[in-house]
């Protein structure tokens, strides 16, 4: 496989079609043409992935032996990777009922996170218990569609989603959230496209959006015709309308705050290849217009945006240059920023000559960002076998992510 920016990727397979090796352009350039990612199998089940450059990214897969407890026979029971490991436990229908995630933040700091789940007879998730003890419960209708979600933690129950309604085609037409806000949705019955949405709270309309499309489903327009009422700041000590005699001339009166959101309109235009070429709109009295142009290979050539606010950040004109013969469709310069790439097409250096700043990036064999140096301030990232970021470190701070959700520092 050969890509104009990512270079050549060479793969080998066994007689059963299983991937055995993968050699990328960057590995070939920086190590050798023998330095490929290798894959090992156990009866056609992937058992190991080895990396020639970042050896600690090694991934191993362990499967349950005959007679294994917790219905693990023949199923994946453990995955070990650079971030730690994850063990799986199964129910009678093969559903995952428990996972134990061990995250190696550092050599001296290993943290464990346990998730459990229960299912109904249709193998639908009924409850999920999170590492902090929160239990989330799902309700379904006769068609198996989610109708409610509630949370219980430390004996306190909170409603996340109170009600969901569907039409005969399975489209969501109504939702009522735990905070009382309600949304109704309208669809184009011929193309099943969303045409409008009305959001209300406490009987007041907050947002009413309408969508317009062209014959190939590109969005041509998006409008909101409602500006919500300004919320009132309550009376009381420390606020407007103080009762201690220090509230000034407005003491004892409610004072309105600025409303959130407001009416807006956006319109879009496309060329014959369905590429966005124009956009314009207005929100909170400020309008904008944007134009783009493209080259023969679909690469952006120019982007010009103008706003009524006069903001330098909001109005700009960018020209895209493509001066790197090894990456013909990757920009070598956008405005004041100059880009350098590795052989796989990942950006490794971004220099801004107007601000005299630079960002340096490092990537692993799977093209995952492993380090970012922003003017000398470095962040590092560790991933699991699925490619999800699990650990982010910045200076002395290290953050952990499980299933994409932050778990704190």
Predicted regions, residues:
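Short, acidic, Ser/Thr-enriched surface-loop or helix-capping motifs
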Residues: 3, 14, 41, 71, ...
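Beta-rich catalytic cores
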Residues: 35, 57, 84, 113, ...
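Short secondary-structure transition motifs
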Residues: 34, 38-63, 68-69, 206, ...
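Intrinsically disordered, low-complexity Ser/Thr- and acidic-rich flexible linkers and loops
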Residues: 27-34, 68-71, 104-110, 228-261, ...
